[in-house]
Regions:
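Compositionally biased, intrinsically disordered low-complexity segments enriched in Pro/Arg/Gln/His
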Residues: 2-5
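Protein-protein interaction/assembly regions in multi-subunit complexes
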Residues: 13-231, 238-254, 264-286
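Extended C-terminal regions of large enzymes
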Residues: 173-207, 213-602
Length: 602
């Protein structure tokens, strides 16, 4: 390995690679040390791609092998992994995405996020299937990655300190240093445990990947490469790309194109499943919901629509120039008692600029608001207050913001006074925008999710809205199968990688996923192969958490959902939830305590 100090200047040439399809068969291992960087390629066996596909699956495999057992998430030895997929770079819609993995500094468990961006396309042109970053630098720097490992370099960037990721990208573009950038904001620099990583403006890293990058003192990552993986059957892929694009513009995605997920808020309020004021109630009323719905936001701030890179759906709805989807809308709105559209949009903008996960930021502030109103803390913070000053305190760890930068679970441990009962998290990750007492299959999904309280790693909420499902009770005989079905489909899409908004346009995801992967890679891949791979991915995630200290006691919701019924009397029943969690692990081929594993170590 050749070490380059500072930012050595070298001539550039195009890398000539052997004919490969979809994957390059290797990763880039980047090791940071003081003011130097060493990078080298590591070849991967072909079996890894068949066993783990790519995206979050490949990333989980790499995390298992490159993260020392029990490592502190913010220690130099803890890796941050950018994992690509075999479909990335193809003409297939919604595939311009990558997975970002680490050990979460918020939960101490696996953290895997997804980001669409042109940075994803540029990064795969490094000629690798993943980038694994280990070590740490002595000062805040820009890390530049090149298709020739010896040409990777670091450059100190004190001028970028304290800037938002957007400002960093604009500055690097204006000086000609980069076109596509992965960067952190002030929250990442301060190692806030739910800081995100912004990739050409698209944030990833719920669970604190931005803090991991900040601990490595990497402000921004730029890339240069010209490698192309290609596809095995160009004509077939082009035909399927046109078909899939047409389906993506049909009825299955009409809601996302017209209104986006922000339209959920009004529906959830009507169904009484909208979390309000730290999950103390389930409705803000018809008029307030209408003000925060797309029509109200449009009237207050104007509306535009955009698309992610390489996407034909166009679900990116912006109000007053600010991107807004349901989870941000709920977390910075009703959850915190905020009903003013401008105040909501200002908080969303602040999270993007500071680099904060909106769900954890809103959940932590909602918890703090309740603590303040109960007299457990002496802070000038009440439901409905302006969130922006508090978000800035958190991002810079100023005053009470330093405590809140650790998330709800950590704050409750310090505040005490029974606050853990209403600290709304699972495994340390704040809850998404679904009321568990009124969506009890979803409640099970939140309990058992490997990342913590997570709506994206399963679609268990879909089961609660199916005909014939009693969403006010969890059935240990049926609910685990619903959760596993949606977990496995999510893992499939997240490993291929395809956007979940395509679910309705791909009625047979296992069959079509196998066809797409076969066309791209040239390998004979069947539906059964994908099902085996996804089961293997599920077990590896669980095995990783088990190695890092997980026990069955973590698969539960806070006491609020068990002891405090909703106005209609709905609550979770301990015996039912305990039985359902045990049944889930049994259905996964483990013991009822989750400790007897079905698969051998990878």
């Amino acid at each position: 390995m050749q070490r380059l100090r500072g930012h050595a200047t070298v001539a550039r040439f195009r890398v000539i690679l052997p004919a490969v399809h979809g994957n390059f068969g290797r990763i880039l291992l980047v090791e940071l040390d003081g003011d130097t960087v060493a990078a080298r390629h590591i070849e991967l066996p072909r079996s890894v791609y068949r066993d783990y596909i790519g995206g979050v699956g490949l990333g989980a495999y790499l995390l298992w092998h490159h993260a020392p057992a029990g490592v502190d998430p913010l220690a130099p030895a803890a890796p941050l992994i950018y994992s690509f997929s075999p479909l990335l770079g193809s003409p297939l819609t919604t595939t311009a995405k990558f997975a970002l993995l680490c050990k979460s500094p918020l939960t101490g468990r696996i953290c895997d996020g997804l980001s669409s961006s042109r940075f994803a396309l540029a990064a795969k042109r490094l000629g690798v299937d993943a980038v694994v970053i280990r070590g740490a630098l002595a000062q805040l720097s820009r890390l530049h990655l090149d298709e020739v490992p010896a040409r990777c370099f670091v450059r100190p960037c004190p001028e970028l300190a304290g800037l938002s990721a957007r400002a960093v990208q604009e500055q690097l573009r204006s000086t000609g240093l980069a076109t596509h950038v992965s960067a952190i904001g002030p929250a990442g620099e301060a190692q806030v445990r739910y800081a995100t990583v912004s990739n050409d403006g698209r944030h990833a890293g719920r669970g604190g990947a931005g803090a991991v990058l900040g601990a490595k003192r990497v402000k921004a990552i730029t890339v240069h490469g010209s490698a192309v993986a290609g596809v095995a059957e160009p004509a077939a892929v082009a035909t399927r790309a046109r078909e899939l694009a047409a389906r993506s513009e049909g009825i299955a995605t009409d809601k996302y194109r017209r209104l986006g997920t922000a339209s959920n808020l009004e529906t959830f309020d009507r169904l009484k499943i909208l979390p309000v004021r730290n999950f103390q109630s389930v409705s803000i009323g018809k008029l307030a919901a209408r003000r925060l719905a797309p029509e109200g936001l449009t009237a207050a701030a104007g509306h535009t629509r955009e698309s992610c890179a390489g996407c034909t759906i166009g679900c990116d709805h912006r109000y007053g120039g600010q991107r807004l989807e349901y989870e941000t809308q709920f977390a910075l709105g009703p959850l915190c008692g905020v009903e003013d559209p401008q105040r909501l949009l200002a908080a969303a903008r602040a999270c993007d600029e500071l680099g904060l996960d909106t769900i954890s930021a809103g959940g932590t502030l909602a918890f703090a608001m309740e603590c303040s109103e109960r007299g457990l803390v002496d802070w000038p913070l009440r439901f409905g207050d302006d969130l922006v000053p508090w978000l800035e305190r958190i991002a810079r760890r100023e005053g009470p913001g330093d405590l809140l930068a650790g998330g709800t679970r950590a704050a409750a441990a310090v505040i005490g006074g029974g606050s853990a009962a209403f600290a709304c998290h699972v495994k340390g990750l704040e809850l998404p925008g679904y009321e568990p007492r009124a969506m009890q299959t979803m409640a099970l999904g939140l309990c058992v999710a490997s990342r913590g309280a997570d709506h994206n790693r399963s679609g268990a909420y879909q089961a609660d809205l199916r005909p014939g499902v009693d969403r006010y009770h969890v059935d240990p005989a049926r609910a685990p199968a619903h959760v596993i079905e949606t977990e496995d489909q999510a893992a499939l899409l997240d490993s291929l990688i395809l956007c979940k908004f395509l679910r309705g346009a791909i009625p047979e995801p296992w069959r079509e996923g196998a066809e797409l992967l076969s066309m791209v890679t040239g390998l004979a891949i069947h539906e059964a192969d994908l099902r085996r791979a996804v089961r293997r991915i599920a077990e590896l995630r669980h095995r990783y958490n088990l190695r890092e200290g997980w026990t069955i006691a973590e698969d539960r919701l806070p006491d609020r959902f068990l002891d405090e019924p909703l106005a209609d009397g709905a609550r979770l029943v301990r015996a039912e939830m305990t039985a359902a969690v045990a049944a889930y692990h049994l259905a996964r081929g483990r013991g009822p305590d989750g400790a007897d594993l079905a698969e051998s170590a990878p």
